[in-house]
């Protein structure tokens, strides 16, 4: 069994999401061969040298899962693209490039965060290219912590404001980009997050059937894609209320 999740946007202000994730690590993930986290794991990440006590606790929880035998793979999202080798080493996880092709159930599957598929949002794509440039990352990682915190808040607020103003089709994936990149990598299954629109889309690429699986964001409920001998299954689950969690 392999589990894939994305867009948890973990932060201290959402203890319900954190509890649900820790429950997953202590339960089903212990039985899994691997756990893939496809970006926006944290709501914000300003550097491995600036881990808060909350982020450190998540790191330790991942390490415990890794030490139990479950392999963990982490991909950058647009919120946490500054996660580096230091965090991954401490957490016992492997950093995946975006995109990456992996073998799931004997099938070549393309994994992405998904933001690079939104090519109609030209302003975002330009900003993404700038922020991910090695020189930009080097500069950002060497800014004072206070400056990084202020910059992260500014970018997050601007992103939220712009997303609200943009048409739905602009912030969703570009239809033509999906078959293009799937053909480029020679796959018939694409799994991504980012858009917060969970679904399994059936496609036709040339004369072959294909599919695009969109992972859900963890906000009002959690989402997990499970891959096992039965195939690919995308399911949601409700968060356990705090009072119930305390009783248990």
UniProtKB/Swiss-Prot annotation:
Pathway field: Glycolipid biosynthesis; lipid IV(A) biosynthesis; lipid IV(A) from (3R)-3-hydroxytetradecanoyl-[acyl-carrier-protein] and UDP-N-acetyl-alpha-D-glucosamine: step 4/6
Compartments where located: Cell inner membrane
Residues bound to substrate: 78-79, 121, 159, 163, 166, 194
SUPFAM superfamilies tied to this protein: Metallo-dependent phosphatases
Membrane topology type: Peripheral membrane protein
Residues bound to Mn(2+) 2: 40, 78, 113, 194
Enzymatic class: hydrolase
EC number: 3.6.1.54
Alphabetic keyword roster: Cell inner membrane, Cell membrane, Hydrolase, Lipid A biosynthesis, Lipid biosynthesis, Lipid metabolism, Manganese, Membrane, Metal-binding
InterPro entries, sorted: Calcineurin-like_PHP_ApaH (IPR004843), LpxH-like (IPR043461), Metallo-depent_PP-like (IPR029052), UDP-diacylglucosamine_Hdrlase (IPR010138)
Keyword Zinc set for record: no
Molecular-function annotations in GO: manganese ion binding; UDP-2,3-diacylglucosamine hydrolase activity
Residue numbers binding Mn(2+) 1: 7, 9, 40, 196
Entry note: cofactor: Binds 2 Mn(2+) ions per subunit in a binuclear metal center.
Catalytic function, reaction form: UDP-2-N,3-O-bis[(3R)-3-hydroxytetradecanoyl]-alpha-D-glucosamine + H2O = 2-N,3-O-bis[(3R)-3-hydroxytetradecanoyl]-alpha-D-glucosaminyl 1-phosphate + UMP + 2 H(+)
Cofactor(s) this protein cannot do without: Mn(2+)
GO biological process: lipid A biosynthetic process
An example Gene Ontology CC term for this record: extrinsic component of plasma membrane
HAMAP family per record: LpxH
Family assignment from sequence similarity: Belongs to the LpxH family.
Function summary: Hydrolyzes the pyrophosphate bond of UDP-2,3-diacylglucosamine to yield 2,3-diacylglucosamine 1-phosphate (lipid X) and UMP by catalyzing the attack of water at the alpha-P atom. Involved in the biosynthesis of lipid A, a phosphorylated glycolipid that anchors the lipopolysaccharide to the outer membrane of the cell.
Record protein name field: UDP-2,3-diacylglucosamine hydrolase
């Amino acid at each position: 069994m392999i589990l894939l999740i994305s867009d948890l946007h973990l932060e201290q202000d959402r203890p319900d999401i954190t509890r649900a994730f820790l429950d997953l690590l202590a339960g089903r993930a212990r039985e899994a061969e691997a756990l893939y986290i496809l970006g926006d794991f944290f709501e914000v990440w300003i550097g491995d040298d600036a881990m808060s006590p909350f982020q450190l606790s998540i790191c330790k929880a991942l390490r415990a899962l890794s030490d139990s035998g479950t392999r963990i793979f982490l991909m950058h999202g647009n919120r946490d693209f500054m996660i580096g080798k230091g965090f991954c080493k401490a957490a016992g996880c492997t950093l995946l490039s975006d995109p990456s092709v992996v073998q799931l159930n004997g099938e070549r599957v393309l994994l992405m965060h998904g933001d690079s598929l939104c090519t109609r949002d030209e302003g975002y794509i330009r900003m993404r290219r700038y922020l991910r440039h090695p020189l930009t990352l080097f500069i950002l990682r060497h800014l004072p912590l206070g400056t990084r915190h202020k910059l992260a808040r500014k970018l997050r607020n601007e992103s939220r404001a712009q997303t609200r103003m943009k048409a739905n089709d602009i912030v969703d994936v570009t239809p033509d980009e999906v078959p293009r990149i799937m053909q480029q990598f020679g796959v018939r299954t694409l799994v991504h997050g980012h858009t917060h629109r969970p679904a399994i889309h059936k496609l036709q690429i040339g004369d072959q059937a294909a599919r695009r699986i969109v992972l859900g964001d963890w906000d009002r409920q959690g989402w997990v894609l499970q891959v096992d001998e039965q195939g690919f299954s995308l399911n949601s689950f409700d968060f356990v209320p705090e009072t119930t969690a305390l009783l248990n």
